[in-house]
C-alpha cells in the first residue's frame, strides 16, 4: 500500500513540533535551575565580621574576632555591643519587612518557574501520546497484524527514552517519576471498568469454572515453581543467590498475568471467543491471588499462611459483593431519578460510582480490581437499561477511548522506564526466570485443562490450550509490585526490579509478536476487520451465545432483579435503539476496503444491496424521546395525526422526507447519525 502525502505531512509536522517543544523544555529546565541556585545564594544568612583589632589594611588575621550575625542572635548582639535602634536597620536591614518581602518575591518567582516547567512537561507528554496514537493508526492502516499496537508503542517509548537519556535527561526523569500508586489509582480502574462494562456476560459466567481454576490454582502453581526454581539455582551458584523470602516474593510478583497487555493484543486480533474469555477471566481474577501470595511472603509463619488463605476467600467474596452492591445502588438512582434529559449527568454518575467502588475496596483492604470489574458487569446488566438512548450510545465509546488512552500511556511508560531504570542485571537470573515462568505456565495449563475436559460438556481444544499457555503475558501489575517490595538485603531490590521489568518486556515482545503467527499455525480464527480502538472490548459474537444458563437464575432474575433495578422502557424505544445501532455498525462497514475499517476509497461507489443503504448525500436522523412513549395503542394509530408520537425514525434525503404521516415533526432530541 502506498503512503498518502498526508501521512508524510503529519509525521514532519509532529517531528518539528516535538523538536521545538524539547528545546523549549530544556531551556525552561535550565532557567529554573539557575533561578533556584541564585535564590539559594541570595537567601543565605547575613553575616558581619567585626574585628576588634582593625589595623586598616582590610585583613582579618584573627578568626576568633569574627562574629556571625544571624536573625537568631541579632537582638542579643545589638544589646551587648550597644548599637542604638536607629542604626539597627542601617547595619542589618529590616528583618521583619524587607526579609519577608524578599521571601514572598522569591516564592512567587519559584512558583511561576515551576508552573512554566510543569506546563512544558505536560505538553511534551501530550505530544508523545499523540505520536503513539499516530503509530497505532499507521499499524492498522498498513495492516501489520504480527506487530501488536502494544509492542509498537513500547518500542516507540524505548527510542524516545534513549534520545532523552543522552540529550535531555531531565525530561525522561519527569516522565518516569510516575508512581506505582498512580497506576493503581488512575490507569488500572479505567481499563478494568471498561472491560467489565462491555464484557459478554454469557460467555464469562458459562466458563466461570475454568476461569477460577486458572486464576487460583494456576497462579499458586506458578508461584511455587518460580519461587522454588529461583532459590535452587541460586543455592547451587548457577545464578545470583536470592534468599528464600526474596525468591518467593519474586514468584508471587511474576505469577500475575497482566490483563492490560493480554487484552490489548487479543482485542486487536479479535481471537476465538473461548480463548478470549478464558484468558481475560484469568488475568482479571488472578490479581487477588497474586496479592494474597505477596502478603503471605511478608511473614512465612504457618499461622499467617492459614490466615492469609482464609483472608483470600474473604477478599474475593467481599470484592465481588462490593462491586455488585455499588452497581445496584447506581441502578436504583438511575431508575428513580429522571436525569435522562441530562446525558452528561448520567455519564458523570457512572464514572464517579466506578471510582468509588475501586477506592472503597482499597480502603477496606479488598481487591479494587475485582470490585470495579463486577461493578461494570452488574451495571451493564441493570443500570444501562435506565440510561437515556443518547448516553447508551456515547458512554460506551467514551469508556473505550479512556481505556485506550490509559493503555497507550502505560505501554509508553514501559518503554521510557527501560532507559531511566537503574539496572542491576544478572544474565543467569533473567534466563532462569524466563525458563521457570514458561515451565510453570505449562504445568498450570495443560494438566488443568486435562482435568477440566473430564467434567466439562464444552471441551477445551488442544489448540486453545497451547494459545492459553502462550498468552501468559506479564505487565504493569507485576512491575508495580516489584517497586513496592523491599528486601531485607537492600542491594537485592535493584536485582528484583530489574529482572521483573525485563521479564515484562520480554513477554510483551516475544509472546506479543508471536501471538498472531501462533494463531495462524494453530488455525485459530482471528479477524483484523475490527481492530484496535474501533473494537476495544467488543462484545462476543452472537453465535457464541450458549443456551445452558441456569433456569433458576433466569427466573429469579426476571422476577425480582430486573423489575427492581431496571427502568421499564417501552418496546418501541428499544426497537429504535437497536435499529440505530445497526445503522452505525453498517455505516462503518459499507465503506470497508481490504478488511480494514480505517481505509476508505473516495472513488468507490457503495453497491451494497442490504436492507439499509447509505449514499454520500443521505442525511439520517433518529428521533427518540422515551418520556413521551406510552404503551397505549391510542398513541400508535395511523389516523394521520401523530403529533404526540416522538418515536418516528425520520430519514431525510435532501428532496424528500419520509415519516408515518408525511409531516415534519419537530423534536429537540434529534441525534445526527451522519
Curated annotation (Swiss-Prot):
An MF annotation (GO) of this entry: sodium:proton antiporter activity
Compositional bias annotation for Acidic residues: 601-618
Signal peptide annotation: 1-24
Residue stretches of biased makeup (Low complexity): 37-55, 627-657
Region (Disordered): 31-65, 591-674
Regulation: LY294002, an inhibitor of the catalytic subunit of PI3-kinase, blocks NHE1-dependent (but not NHE1-independent) increase in intracellular pH in response to cAMP.
Induction profile: Expression is induced 6 hours after starvation. Down-regulated by Pseudomonas aeruginosa infection (strains PAO1 and PA14).
UniProt key word Protein transport: no
Topology in the lipid bilayer: Multi-pass membrane protein
Traits of the deletion mutant: Impaired polarity. Starved mutant cells differentiate, and in response to the chemoattractant cAMP retain directional sensing; however, they cannot attain a polarized morphology, but instead extend mislocalized pseudopodia around the cell and exhibit decreased velocity. In response to chemoattractant, mutant cells lack a leading edge localization of F-actin and have significantly attenuated de novo F-actin polymerization but increased abundance of membrane-associated phosphatidylinositol 3,4,5-trisphosphate. However, they retain directional sensing.
Cellular localisation: Membrane
GO CC terms of this entry: cell leading edge; cytoplasm; leading edge membrane; membrane; plasma membrane
InterPro entries documented for this protein: Cation/H_exchanger_CPA1, Cation/H_exchanger_TM, NaH_exchanger
Annotated TM spans: 120-140, 144-164, 175-195, 213-233, 275-297, 314-334, 336-356, 359-379, 401-421, 432-452, 460-480, 499-519
Pfam families with a match to the protein in the record: Na_H_Exchanger
Residue spans of biased composition, Polar residues class: 662-674
Role description: Regulation of intracellular pH homeostasis in response to cAMP, which is essential for chemotaxis. Necessary for F-actin localization and the kinetics of actin polymerization during chemotaxis and cell polarity but not for directional sensing.
UniProt record similarity statement: Belongs to the monovalent cation:proton antiporter 1 (CPA1) transporter (TC 2.A.36) family.
Protein name stated in the entry: Sodium/hydrogen exchanger 1
Organism in which the protein naturally occurs: Dictyostelium discoideum (Social amoeba)
Source taxonomy: Eukaryota, Amoebozoa, Evosea, Eumycetozoa, Dictyostelia
